Amino acid sequence: MQKIRKGDKVVVLAGKDKGRSGEVLSVQPKDDTALVRGVNMIRRHQKQSQSQEGGIITKEAPIQLSNIALADPKDGKPTRVGFIFQKDGKKVRVAKRSGEVING
């Protein structure tokens, strides 16, 4: 089970976007990276094709998982993630900072 998943709210801990937060668009576990909306933006020169216009576009670049932390559901501050088994035997993610169960 992954600690950070698609749709989670995360906070950037290091790098040029330190302190910014956003939603995880995708996670690449093999590369230990994630795409976060509005974070680590890069500019790329796009060649014109039949389906797309040419020009300079800005898009998100992958960011290392070690440089982001899950935002605590209670106060939005960065937290570590733990796992517990509920009474029905289901394994769930828990915010270590507040003890809150994380959705998903």
UniProtKB/Swiss-Prot annotation:
Superkingdom of the organism of origin: Bacteria
CDD domains: KOW_RPL26
GO terms, biological process: translation
Keyword Transcription regulation: no
Annotated keywords: Ribonucleoprotein, Ribosomal protein, RNA-binding, rRNA-binding
Entry GO terms, CC: ribonucleoprotein complex; ribosome
GO molecular function terms listed in the Swiss-Prot or TrEMBL record: rRNA binding; structural constituent of ribosome
Pfam families xref list: KOW (PF00467), ribosomal_L24 (PF17136)
Bridged cysteine pairs (disulfide): none
Its biological purpose: One of two assembly initiator proteins, it binds directly to the 5'-end of the 23S rRNA, where it nucleates assembly of the 50S subunit.
Assembly: Part of the 50S ribosomal subunit.
Similarity section: Belongs to the universal ribosomal protein uL24 family.
Name of the protein described by the UniProt record: Large ribosomal subunit protein uL24
